[in-house]
């Protein structure tokens, strides 16, 4: 998927009514389909994982939407996926 389109999809996806358990783990599983060795980094209130452009460019729109629904977003400062 085009990177700018992926960012747009993330911003527009309604996540209010989406309920799923293990949102962090599920997002990491999706990322693992597009990156051989996902190595997340953790802080007290955020998780960062995978180069955004590298993974999003390989994803179909459905996976980008799923990531948004799971609460993953584009961290512009670090150019990666993030979850709070």
Residue ranges: model-predicted function:
Residues 55-84:
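Short, compact, well-ordered microdomains
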């Amino acid at each position: 998927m085009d990177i700018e389109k992926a960012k747009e999809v993330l911003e527009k996806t309604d996540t209010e009514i989406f309920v799923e358990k293990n949102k962090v783990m599920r997002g990491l599983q999706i990322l693992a389909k597009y990156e051989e060795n996902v190595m997340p980094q953790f802080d007290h209130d955020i998780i960062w994982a995978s180069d955004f452009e590298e993974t999003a460019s390989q994803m179909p729109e459905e996976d980008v939407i799923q990531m948004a629904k799971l609460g993953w977003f584009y961290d512009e400062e670090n150019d990666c996926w993030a979850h709070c």
